[in-house]
Amino acid sequence: MEIKKVVVIGSGTMGSGIAAHLCNANIPVTLLDLKTEISKQARDKIHKSRPPLLLDKSKINNIKVGNILDNFDEVKEADWVVEAVVERIDIKHDIYKKIFKERKKGAIVSSNTSSIPIKILSQHLSEEEKKDFCITHFFNPVRYMGLLEIVKNENNDLDKINSL
């Protein structure tokens, strides 16, 4: 599977770091948060960061910003949706419910969690949804760590997950 477009939900340290990393790989990213202003501030921090998060400052144009109320339809066009929100299972479950309702068929959905087991994250997902769900734990700072931990579940489509 080729990843051509990504949506990152949550524009904190990890979400913005993931967005910048994908941007460096020339993958267009939409960065969503509760308010568009929060996503804009995150994009500004990416642009001004020291040490730089971007290989080339012009790549910032590959990051589109928005909010989860007005711009959630961006999920429909994404090949991969990364959840990078606060470590609260109730919030994560609510977001997954919305993502799986809106995503295009076959799009990968992942969590950047480092502390919640995949069985808990995926407990409300259907067997079909679990095929496309995994944990993609990026390490901070994303650009410099060069490490991605992928935690799969027993239902994963391995060819798809291996494309990450």
Where are these regions (language model features)?
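Conserved structured core elements
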Residues: 8, 12, 16, 93, ...
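Short, glycine/charged-enriched secondary-structure capping and boundary segments
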Residues: 21-24, 44-46, 94-98, 122-127, ...
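Structural motif
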Residues: 9, 17, 66, 84, ...
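NAD(P)+-binding Rossmann beta1-loop-alpha1 motif at the extreme N-terminus of oxidoreductases
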Residues: 1-48, 102
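Rossmann-like NAD(P)-binding element
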Residues: 34-41, 52-109, 115-120, 147-148
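Short, flexible turn/loop "capping" segments at secondary-structure junctions
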Residues: 23-24, 75, 141-145
